[in-house]
């Protein structure tokens, strides 16, 4: 079971996730050495492949640097769970097929270092010690598709067309954001009923 | 040179109900009338790439996508974040960016031309009604001229360059109405900081901030307002054109780019400008805003005047007015970095830089300077900096135990003279020489 690292503060920003002084590379294994350095410099020594970060609201605010996602993934983090995310960070997560799960009350569910049971298909996360469980906001189908493809670029390439046709198709199928695929960068704020998660959807093992 | 997507149709697509500015622009640049919550696939008028992600961008274009920019004239690379280069690896990345620009025909604004947002505005590469995506979060700045400016990561930026399009969820809008008149000595920066305090650091996440300022504020001041919107989490910060401000700068302002009466807003706030005093954001979140008077007297090690928020000619004028004939306190250092070569030239010609130099300012190459802590004035542990920039996060300008306070250029200049947080009126006690 993955270990949970609790960073309970709200507004943890990209300068804390990966300080700008380390933006001299986009090699994930390099960036990983400095993940969360200005928040908790010992984090990279504790984190194990597959671990989960639980954080306060507005995680990833600040810069547009995609390195914030790369550094965490490089460090082995499989998912970040927070009440909500800053929008550029959230979008970067989707584009990289990296899990950013929105879950109200998540920082109360775990103490730092506890283990978690994450059920992506069922949309729940559970603390086996306490037996308590929370549901997270379902991952948009679009995000799952991107994750399955291995990222936004791969998803687009799979459509064999970077000229935008795939984008247009996405728009049409989204029905402008209501029924169908919540393609927006803000599924948490979607109006109307949440789309069903495809229960039979082929889920990739998240990056271990 | 042609820039931007094809001309607007002149009227919004068939709408069914009143629209915000964000809804209007995304409708115009998409294929149908859209409203908050809808998904829009839109034409992108300008894609801006900064030096610090240029390598990632090129890798995504060439290695991952095997694509070239669909419209090279709609792509600009700006070398500004670490310019001139500070290390060999940074120099190598910038070399590759130059080679890429030469090869593909995209625009390159090289070392010394200035900060991306300032340069694109000066070059009119952001215009009313356009969609401008930048690989820098402060791309909301283009909202100063009612362009939908938004920051994105390297992958999104590459896709936009390759396809000429992007997808956006149409944001809800927060309407910010500014009323009354500013007191003397209170500036657009104070308004912007107050706006972030009112909205909260994540108070407009995923949303568009639509600022109704009437005919107040210059283009530069509007840039300061739009720039700070991302500090409330906003996707865009659109200042509604008012009076003749934009037409005076030579922009074509489409008749449709104004919000409709009755447009739906997620939230509406009003800020009475006449009640505002100079404001300061204390560590380590931008919405931690106080009156400067409350922080007065705090010892300051470094003052930085510059950035995309406040490095324009009017900002340097405001600083020079305070510093004229005075000296920076010997226990404090003052860095001044003009936002662009154009600003620098103007400040050279009108004597502003001489005034600042004589006061003891250290002048730097137009660019981002130490704003994001990579060079040209990073902070040591325990040091205190008053900066005209936009972020005071932990570790932002160097060591994580340094402390950053955000303020207007006039307050920053007064602080430099006193060596402590000060108001412009405080420097009266320091005799000015002729």
From Swiss-Prot, chain A:
Pathway: Amino-acid biosynthesis; L-leucine biosynthesis; L-leucine from 3-methyl-2-oxobutanoate: step 2/4. Signal peptide: none annotated. Belongs to the LeuD family. LeuD type 2 subfamily. Keywords: Amino-acid biosynthesis, Branched-chain amino acid biosynthesis, Leucine biosynthesis, Lyase. It catalyses: (2R,3S)-3-isopropylmalate = (2S)-2-isopropylmalate. Catalyzes the isomerization between 2-isopropylmalate and 3-isopropylmalate, via the formation of 2-isopropylmaleate. Heterodimer of LeuC and LeuD. InterPro entries: Aconitase/3IPM_dehydase_swvl, AconitaseA/IPMdHydase_ssu_swvl, IPMI_Swivel, LeuD, LeuD_type2/HacB/DmdB. GO terms for molecular function: 3-isopropylmalate dehydratase activity. The keyword Cytoplasm does not apply. It is an enzyme of class 4 (lyase). This is 3-isopropylmalate dehydratase small subunit 2. Its EC number is 4.2.1.33. One of its GO terms (biological process) is L-leucine biosynthetic process. Residues 163-208 are annotated as: Disordered. The gene is leuD2. SUPFAM superfamilies: LeuD/IlvD-like (SSF52016).
Swiss-Prot record, chain B:
SUPFAM superfamilies: Aconitase iron-sulfur domain (SSF53732). Pathway: Amino-acid biosynthesis; L-leucine biosynthesis; L-leucine from 3-methyl-2-oxobutanoate: step 2/4. Keywords: 4Fe-4S, Amino-acid biosynthesis, Branched-chain amino acid biosynthesis, Iron, Iron-sulfur, Leucine biosynthesis, Lyase, Metal-binding. Pfam families: Aconitase. [4Fe-4S] cluster binds at residues 308, 368, 371. The keyword Iron applies. Binds 1 [4Fe-4S] cluster per subunit. It comes from the Bacteria. The keyword Nucleotidyltransferase does not apply. Its cofactor is [4Fe-4S] cluster. Belongs to the aconitase/IPM isomerase family. LeuC type 2 subfamily. Heterodimer of LeuC and LeuD. Catalyzes the isomerization between 2-isopropylmalate and 3-isopropylmalate, via the formation of 2-isopropylmaleate. This is 3-isopropylmalate dehydratase large subunit 1. It comes from Deinococcus radiodurans (strain ATCC 13939 / DSM 20539 / JCM 16871 / CCUG 27074 / LMG 4051 / NBRC 15346 / NCIMB 9279 / VKM B-1422 / R1).
